[in-house]
Amino acid sequence: MIPSREEWIAALVERHGEERQNAFLNATVAICGLGGLGSNIATALTRAGVGKLILIDFDKVDITNLNRQQYKMSQLGRPKTECCLENIREISPYTEAIIHTVKLTEENIPEMLGEADIICEAFDKADQKAMLVNTVLETFPDKYVLSGTGMAGFGSANTIQSRKVFGKLYLCGDEKSDVNDGIGLVASRVMVCAAHEAHMVLRLLSGETEV
């Protein structure tokens, strides 16, 4: 039997406290890119009881994604937005979610992300990461932005950290490793970086702005 919404919230309040949980429930977080970073961030924020997620990706689930992304073989070939929504619904049917199966650009970012309190950048390519961060900082100077950079390879997970760059911009990762160096990506290290982003979101929603 699936618990009621009231039972679900009561269980979260027991773990997080009422004031903090209310902050989570009243928040809207956008996750831009639903690959290794984004799909894991979405899972973590759903489990924490964040009230509303905006899930954005244009891609479909591929077999090469399964080593680090929160998808299943039964979902191969389907849009990541639909599959991510399906997966978080299994965790909590009470999490509100909007999906956009589109590629984010400088032109559509204002429309797609205007409702979000916090924006998580979770793209693969450096130029797309920079485009999103720069556009958001220019368009929405009052919004928090978290970006993932440096999570490739089998190096120590302890080198992955969160850093406040300036204002409302935060970076999560080792800021060095790059998949283009031929060192690959593995779930355990990517998930550490995703956890840093998700945890910083929860800290910000709790009013804690320092890393």
Regions found by a protein language model. Name each.
Residues 1-29:
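N-terminal charged helix/coil linker that caps or initiates catalytic domains
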Residues 2-3, 112-118, 122-211:
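Glycine-rich phosphate/adenylate-binding loop
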Residues 31-34, 55:
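Hydrophobic Val/Ile/Leu positions in short beta-strands of Rossmann-like dinucleotide-binding domains
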Residues 37:
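Hydrophobic/small residue at the entry helix of a nucleotide-binding pocket
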Residues 47-52:
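Conserved S-adenosyl-L-methionine
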Residues 57-91:
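Glycine-rich phosphate-binding loop and adjoining beta1-alpha1-beta2 segment
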Residues 81-116, 123-126:
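A structured beta-alpha segment of the ubiquitous adenosine-cofactor-binding alpha/beta core
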